[in-house]
Design a protein with these regions (language model features):
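Short, conserved catalytic-motif segment at the N-terminal edge
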Residues: 1-54, 74, 90-102, 157-162
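Non-transmembrane alpha-helical segments in soluble domains
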Residues: 5, 9, 67-70, 81-82, ...
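Extended low-complexity intrinsically disordered regions
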Residues: 17, 115-145
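Short, charged, amphipathic alpha-helices and their helix-cap/turn boundaries
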Residues: 32-33, 83, 133-164
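Active-site helix/loop module of the DD-peptidase/beta-lactamase fold
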Residues: 48, 71-124, 128, 158
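Short, conserved phosphate/pyrophosphate- and ester-handling motifs at nucleotide-, phospho-/glycolipid
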Residues: 59
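Cytochrome P450
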Residues: 167-172
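Conserved small/polar residues in nucleotide/adenosyl-binding loops
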Residues: 178-185
Length: 187
């Protein structure tokens, strides 16, 4: 185990990663170790069983978890997202893709769980090329390892959607909102 810890420390020291956590089961002996930082800038130490952002790699995991919740009747694909995430009860949309934050209109339909999973809920992503994505970026949404998904949902719920839910496909952060519901239900 010491060699593994030393190897990870070399990667941390070289700046290739902030930290690492591993669990090894060998001959019915469980080894669970952690080293490094959850947030390098703030020097917040990584703790065992921390939550990790693995960005797009979460999508298949979240899809699987969502299907399990649907099978157990904790979630329906046709539920509006404000049923599970009350921060989203007053969503609006931009009047046009070139709009500013003051130029919004009411939604014809609230986004659903199905639309979250299909990237058709009206959200965007800060790496996309549109006004709202720039606003996400300016507010440092989805960057900080020190802010929780709950905090980011609260911030993003204050912003309008890019377009009417269900009207088109647009890659977005929306699948992560399903993750929060899956996490809450599993507690």
């Amino acid at each position: 185990m010491d060699n593994i810890k030393l190897d990870f420390q070399k990667h941390i020291d070289a700046g290739r990663c902030n930290g690492a956590e591993w669990i090894i089961n060998h001959k019915n002996n469980i080894y669970h170790e952690v080293i490094g930082y959850k947030d390098l800038e703030l020097k917040n130490k990584l703790k065992k069983n921390s939550y990790y952002r693995i960005w797009s790699m979460t999508k298949p995991i979240i899809g699987f978890a969502a299907m399990q919740l649907i099978e157990k009747n904790f979630l329906s694909l046709d539920d509006t997202i404000d049923k599970h995430l009350s921060d989203f009860k007053n969503l609006k949309k931009l009047s046009s893709i070139e709009s500013n934050l003051k130029n919004t209109t009411s939604l014809e339909n609230k986004p659903t769980v199905r639309q979250l999973l299909q990237h058709t809920a009206g959200f965007t992503y800060n790496s996309c090329d549109n006004f709202l994505a720039k606003e996400y970026e300016d507010r440092s949404l989805f960057h900080s390892a020190s802010s929780s998904l709950e905090e980011e949902i609260s911030k993003i719920s204050e912003l309008p959607l890019l377009y009417e839910p269900g009207s088109k496909w647009h890659y977005s952060i929306s699948v992560s909102y399903t993750h929060l519901r899956a996490h809450e239900t599993s507690q």
